[in-house]
């Protein structure tokens, strides 16, 4: 992983710096949004947010991704400093077209885990070690991680990131994502209550 460039990114929650990274092995791009001074000895409030075009850009109500992205940026801004890594592994790393296929299977009654498995994938194909590389490049040694996903905590810890606290990121359910969130809690171990 290498840092390519950084620039100012004004948002409704204040000015972030956007850092552009490139994987050396395949040229895939990732970004980190940094708010305030992260060069302190206190653990950095951090979010590793996996790419979700449908939720983040198209406001899909099928998932909680867009709401989590917005809430994370607000929380980091309110905190006064922090980092959000936008992890470019769409659809829990099955890719956009396979995610749309999984949606079609969900429309026919499968849950999100069953749909992934029907397509030949595990419930979660993501590799969080890339995010550890980004934290290291940004010289972030200790984090408070905004997540409901114990798998993410474990994978980042295994990659050498010192997570001193898991900070819940609870967003409101809606009728379109209630079954999805129930599946994430029951089958993937997500902690969806404080």
Swiss-Prot record:
> Cross-referenced InterPro entries, in alphabetical order?
GTP_cyclohydro_II, RibA, RibA-like_sf
Which GO BP annotation is one of this protein's? Answer: riboflavin biosynthetic process
Q: Where does GTP bind?
A: 47-51, 68, 90-92, 112, 147, 152
Which cellular component, as a GO term, is one annotated location?
cytosol
* Active site per UniProt: 124, 126
The enzyme's E.C. designation? 3.5.4.25
Q: Which reaction does it catalyse?
A: GTP + 4 H2O = 2,5-diamino-6-hydroxy-4-(5-phosphoribosylamino)-pyrimidine + formate + 2 phosphate + 3 H(+)
The record's listing under CDD domains reads: GTP_cyclohydro2
Tell me one Pfam family matched here.
Answer: GTP_cyclohydro2
Q: Which domain of life is it from?
A: Bacteria
EC class:
hydrolase
Is Nucleotide-binding included in the keywords of this UniProt record? yes
Q: What pathway is it annotated to?
A: Cofactor biosynthesis; riboflavin biosynthesis; 5-amino-6-(D-ribitylamino)uracil from GTP: step 1/4
Q: Name one GO molecular function term.
A: GTP cyclohydrolase II activity
Gene3D superfamilies recorded: GTP cyclohydrolase II
Q: Where are the transmembrane segments?
A: none
Q: Where does Zn(2+) bind?
A: 52, 63, 65
What this chain does, per the entry, is described as: Catalyzes the conversion of GTP to 2,5-diamino-6-ribosylamino-4(3H)-pyrimidinone 5'-phosphate (DARP), formate and pyrophosphate.
Q: How does it assemble?
A: Homodimer.
Give the UniProt family note: Belongs to the GTP cyclohydrolase II family.
Matches recorded under HAMAP family? RibA (MF_00179)
Protein name (Swiss-Prot/TrEMBL): GTP cyclohydrolase-2
Organism in which the protein naturally occurs: Buchnera aphidicola subsp. Acyrthosiphon pisum (strain APS) (Acyrthosiphon pisum symbiotic bacterium)
